[in-house]
Design a protein with these regions (language model features):
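The AdoMet/dcAdoMet-binding core of the Class I SAM-like
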Residues: 16-141, 152-160, 164, 170, ...
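Class I S-adenosyl-L-methionine
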Residues: 8, 150-217
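Short, small-residue-biased leader/transition segments that mark boundaries at the very start
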Residues: 2-7, 140
Length: 217
């Protein structure tokens, strides 16, 4: 089957629902495991690469995709319209958009990044503004899933402490520098969550199913 490349971040956007063999598979598996409702906000939509993994796992949430880069959504629309389900795109700054929301979300995915000196890092807003704002915009059983990146000026412990707003689980990888932080009252304890995250990833067919490590925060 053909696959198409999302040029902005050089991550593959599948032409059909299925695994990405990237950190998106873990994030999609966390939605499948922990989501308790139909409303999902995706801050940093880019080319929508995570959507294929979500739909392959049977996640049918209504997705609000937010990004200042609209060309990625155009690419996504051109190859995913037949299978992507309900996806609405907002070309807007993530902080401004989230502040305007009056209805709470069941899931917020924070996947923002910026280029800095040839590296891809977290923007200031992901560290200083969004953590508390996202916590205010989820339901009582809602979850926040953050894709963390090595960022100059922040050790991992400091970065994690600044974006963490409640109980959660941190996922680490053997082949990626990223770390995924899953927060919320429905996340559960690490042994239980790890077992079912890996199960979801095996069902998805993700190559990362055997290389994740989890710890409780």
């Amino acid at each position: 089957r053909q696959r198409q490349m999302c040029i902005r971040d050089r991550s593959e956007l599948p032409c059909y629902p299925g695994p990405t063999h990237s950190v998106w598979d873990v994030m999609a598996s966390a939605v499948a495991l922990c989501a308790r409702g139909p409303r999902l906000a995706m801050l940093g939509f880019s080319g929508g690469g995570m959507v294929g993994a979500l739909r392959a796992l049977g996640c049918d949430q209504e997705i609000a995709g937010v990004d200042v880069w609209s060309e990625g959504f155009g690419l996504f629309e051109s190859i995913a319209t037949e299978w992507c389900g309900p996806v609405r795109f907002y070309r807007e700054d993530a902080v401004d958009w989230l502040r305007r929301q009056r209805v709470l979300y069941d899931v917020i995915v924070e996947d923002l990044s910026v280029s800095e000196n040839g590296d891809v890092v977290k923007p200031d807003a992901s560290i200083s503004l969004l953590p508390d704002l996202m916590q205010k915009k989820i339901t009582g059983e809602g979850i926040i899933i953050s894709n963390l990146l090595p960022t100059p000026g922040f050790s991992w412990p400091r970065l994690i402490s600044m974006v963490r707003t409640g109980p959660g689980i941190l996922v680490e990888f053997e082949s990626y520098h990223n770390r995924v932080l899953i927060q919320g009252s429905s996340v559960g304890e690490v042994r239980w969550a790890g077992r079912f995250l890996r199960r979801n990833m095996r069902v998805l067919g993700s190559a990362l199913a055997g290389e994740i490590r989890l710890r409780t925060l």
